[in-house]
């Protein structure tokens, strides 16, 4: 069986940057998981004494708080600073972009529409920057019964599928006087999605590696499954079932933006050793 990695996969710029920030700030705590990969979180705690705190109110004056790549709500960031917490911001620059857009466009009187998952930490943060509120949707049908202003600003969660975002934009544009569409899907997300789309069309089994809570990994899996019915989303080599590979001839592999190289290599090695 041939094993091939997608042309683009794994750690993105924002995650690499955040990991470096965390490693440079030993004996600190991240507010929320720095990235959606439990194994990498465990490594940071073991090797660099970087802990994890889920409640921003638990940080005391003088404590060091590393902000997760997904960002946090504006009011919580303000509280941390007001309480003299040493804030180290590891928010991905691609995430701060929609935050800034939401704030600026909301203050200019635009209705803010966010394409994404309302429960995702990135969207909780982005939404908080819309001074006069924002609406979060995942599909065009959710817009049908909404009474919206004539001036709309549209942003997307950085890890969503481009084609799904276009469906939202294409619904709004003919119906409203002014629709400002901002491309806030990050380059790495787009490149990884295109790469998995390409390789999944020629593979008879696909392995997508990443955290179960990772939005961008879920999107990669969705694209892969569209083209290759035998697609599997795993977190590491321990999730592999080697019966999957029986009589397969081409195994394609991709990984989410928060999946470190060492986990990817462990998966590749495990598959190679099984055939």
Curated annotation (Swiss-Prot):
Isopentenyl diphosphate binds at residues 36, 70, 120, 214-216, 258. The active site is at residue 122. The keyword 4Fe-4S applies. InterPro entries: LytB/IspH (IPR003451). Dimethylallyl diphosphate binds at residues 36, 70, 120, 214-216, 258. Keywords: 4Fe-4S, Iron, Iron-sulfur, Isoprene biosynthesis, Metal-binding, Oxidoreductase. Its EC number is 1.17.7.4. Its cofactor is [4Fe-4S] cluster. It catalyses: isopentenyl diphosphate + 2 oxidized [2Fe-2S]-[ferredoxin] + H2O = (2E)-4-hydroxy-3-methylbut-2-enyl diphosphate + 2 reduced [2Fe-2S]-[ferredoxin] + 2 H(+); dimethylallyl diphosphate + 2 oxidized [2Fe-2S]-[ferredoxin] + H2O = (2E)-4-hydroxy-3-methylbut-2-enyl diphosphate + 2 reduced [2Fe-2S]-[ferredoxin] + 2 H(+). GO terms for molecular function: 4 iron, 4 sulfur cluster binding; 4-hydroxy-3-methylbut-2-enyl diphosphate reductase activity; metal ion binding. (2E)-4-hydroxy-3-methylbut-2-enyl diphosphate binds at residues 36, 70, 120, 158, 214-216, 258. GO terms for biological process: dimethylallyl diphosphate biosynthetic process; isopentenyl diphosphate biosynthetic process, methylerythritol 4-phosphate pathway; terpenoid biosynthetic process. Gene3D superfamilies: 3.40.50.11270, 4-hydroxy-3-methylbut-2-enyl diphosphate reductase, catalytic domain (3.40.1010.20). [4Fe-4S] cluster binds at residues 12, 92, 186. Belongs to the IspH family. Catalyzes the conversion of 1-hydroxy-2-methyl-2-(E)-butenyl 4-diphosphate (HMBPP) into a mixture of isopentenyl diphosphate (IPP) and dimethylallyl diphosphate (DMAPP). Acts in the terminal step of the DOXP/MEP pathway for isoprenoid precursor biosynthesis. This is 4-hydroxy-3-methylbut-2-enyl diphosphate reductase. The lineage of its organism: Bacteria, Pseudomonadati, Campylobacterota, Epsilonproteobacteria, Campylobacterales.
